[in-house]
Design a protein with these regions (language model features):
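Active-site beta-alpha turn of Rossmann-fold NAD(P)-dependent dehydrogenases/reductases
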Residues: 29-32, 89-91, 154
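A conserved pocket-lining segment of Rossmann-fold NAD(P)-dependent short-chain dehydrogenase/reductase
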Residues: 53-58, 99-100, 106-128, 132
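Conserved loop-to-helix N-cap of the C-terminal "lid" that shapes the substrate pocket in Rossmann-like
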Residues: 87, 124-134, 150, 220, ...
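Conserved Rossmann-fold NAD(P)-dependent oxidoreductase catalytic core, especially the SDR/UDP-sugar
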Residues: 2-61
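Glycine/proline-rich active-site loop of Rossmann-fold NAD(P)-dependent oxidoreductases
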Residues: 81-83, 95-108, 140-151
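Active-site Tyr-X1-5-Lys
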Residues: 56-86
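Conserved C-terminal active-site "lid" loop/helix of NAD(P)H-dependent oxidoreductases
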Residues: 188-219
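Mid/C-terminal beta-alpha module of Rossmann-like enzyme folds, strongest
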Residues: 136-195, 223, 227-242
Length: 242
């Protein structure tokens, strides 16, 4: 599984960046993830200075993101070309979708409204609207201020109970009761959708995303709108019928 994720991520990034350098592309804006920043650490606050600990036994996804991004920076830094690089590191991306594919972040929200997650989990996640992510890429491409920068995109961090509260306030059925870490781990043995989230139970981490505002001028879409637009997309693609 690790090879399936890591090798394509690193080699794909290497091919694209190498070709861009060969063609003397003026600037590259690379989509990475906060997963390249925070995995494998015990601390709770992160900035663009941090990197996931790829030498530790971390999951394949954050390892692939960190190694792919490191490869891009390595190629740029060793090149004698004038090509500039900006890396965008989004938190959990939500909002309106163009396809029926569901990400791990979206899976939590869909589980809360379709009943597959019957109780609020002790999960604390950073969220950002897909429209803000798209805008950040455009602004990064146009701005020389972003040259050579990693930029975290995270509107806010919410516990699952906070997401459920927003859903209920907007007329959706969502859990009212919250599970402790112990109960959540126990339930994850019987509810498959919970297993991928086990490593996040009870961990509250925050990311400093001031660069997005200071360098790119990003003004985040209201998080409630992002969540509701996400749910409307899930409904449109038949992920639930509520």
């Amino acid at each position: 599984m690790k090879i399936d994720l890591i090798k394509p991520a690193v080699e794909g990034t290497e091919r694209v960046v190498s070709l861009a350098l060969k063609q003397n592309v003026r600037k590259i804006v690379l989509t990475s993830s906060v997963a390249a920043i925070s995995s494998g650490h015990t601390k709770k606050q992160f900035s663009e200075e941090d990197w996931s600990k790829v030498d530790e036994p971390i999951p394949a996804y954050p390892k692939s993101k960190a190694l792919a991004e490191k490869k891009a920076w390595d190629l740029i830094n060793k090149s004698n070309k004038k090509t500039k690089l900006t890396v965008i590191n989004p938190a959990g991306v939500i909002g309106p979708s163009l396809t029926s594919e569901v990400s791990s972040t979206q899976l939590i929200i869909s589980g809360l409204v379709n009943g597959k997650i019957p109780i609020n989990l002790p999960i604390h996640i950073g969220y950002v609207d897909v429209r803000d992510v798209a805008l950040a890429h455009v602004k990064a491409l146009e701005s020389t201020k972003s040259d050579g920068e990693r930029i975290i995109l995270s509107n806010t961090e919410l516990w699952t109970k906070d997401v459920s509260k927003i859903l209920r306030e907007n007329g959706y059925n969502a859990p009212r009761f919250s599970a402790s870490v112990g109960v959540a781990k126990f339930l994850s043995n019987f509810i498959p959708i919970l297993k991928p989230s086990r490593r996040f139970f009870g961990k509250a981490m925050t990311k400093n995303s001031t660069k997005a505002e200071d360098i790119l001028g990003i003004k985040y879409i209201d998080i409630s709108k992002s969540i509701i637009d996400e749910v409307e997309s899930l409904k449109r693609f038949g992920k639930f019928s509520g």
